[in-house]
Design a protein with these regions (language model features):
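Short, well-structured N-terminal submotif of metal-dependent ribonuclease cores
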Residues: 1-41, 51-62, 146-158
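Acidic, PIN/NYN-like endoribonuclease modules and their adjacent C-terminal/linker elements
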Residues: 2, 112-158
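Short, flexible helix/strand-to-coil boundary loops that buttress conserved ligand/catalytic motifs
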Residues: 16, 54, 81, 129-132
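Short, flexible loop segments at the rims of nucleotide/cofactor-binding pockets, characterized by
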Residues: 17-20, 45, 94-98
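Short, hydrophobic beta-strand segments that form beta-sheet elements in well-ordered domains
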Residues: 41-43, 50, 117-120
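Short, surface-exposed acidic-centric catalytic microdomains
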Residues: 46-57, 71-74
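Active-site regions of enzymes building and remodeling cell-envelope glycoconjugates
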Residues: 59-68, 134-139
Length: 158
């Protein structure tokens, strides 16, 4: 039984926009997590990012566990950011701040004991995850929202 998933901002941008090409995937994951009683978590960092263009009241907060950024997360973020900075030239990232969000969210996913998965459609973020996975032991798996939930979990979509 899976315990929890940390959902990033890109998930909510797709899930809350039924005209987005990834809406059906996001909706499928959301329903799957509810049905399987997999705890859905959202970081206060992702909430802040979402609020740049949306309103916190739009988020399905009654179905989410909010994860505040804490001291343990900050220490792990520093470790992750050091790895990313040392390999920055190899990543071929588009213009992007490394510490502000990707490494913070990954640190939260890694520190929170229940988190098994991190769900995102952000390909640049996935590059950073793959680098960290090669350099350190991460305890969570990156799930690409472009892959439907039934393919990810190997279940029939009936």
């Amino acid at each position: 039984m899976h315990e929890a998933v940390l959902l990033d901002t890109s998930f909510f941008l797709r899930f809350l926009n039924d005209s987005d090409p990834l809406f059906n995937n996001a909706d499928g994951y959301f329903r799957y997590f509810l049905q399987r009683e997999i705890t859905m978590m959202v970081s206060t960092i992702s909430i802040a990012e979402y609020c740049v263009g949306g309103d916190v009241a739009e988020l399905p907060l009654k179905n989410l566990q909010i994860v505040p950024f804490n001291l343990d997360h900050s220490k792990r973020t520093g470790e992750f950011a050091k790895i990313v900075f040392q390999n920055k030239g190899k990543l071929k990232l588009r213009e992007r701040n490394i510490i502000p969000n990707d490494t913070k969210l990954f640190a939260q996913a890694d520190c929170e004991k229940a988190v098994e998965f991190y769900l995102s459609s952000d390909k640049e973020s996935e590059k950073i995850y793959n680098l960290l996975k090669r350099q350190t032991a991460l305890k969570f798996q990156f799930m690409d929202l472009n892959i439907p939930y039934n393919e990810m979990f190997g279940v029939l979509d009936l």
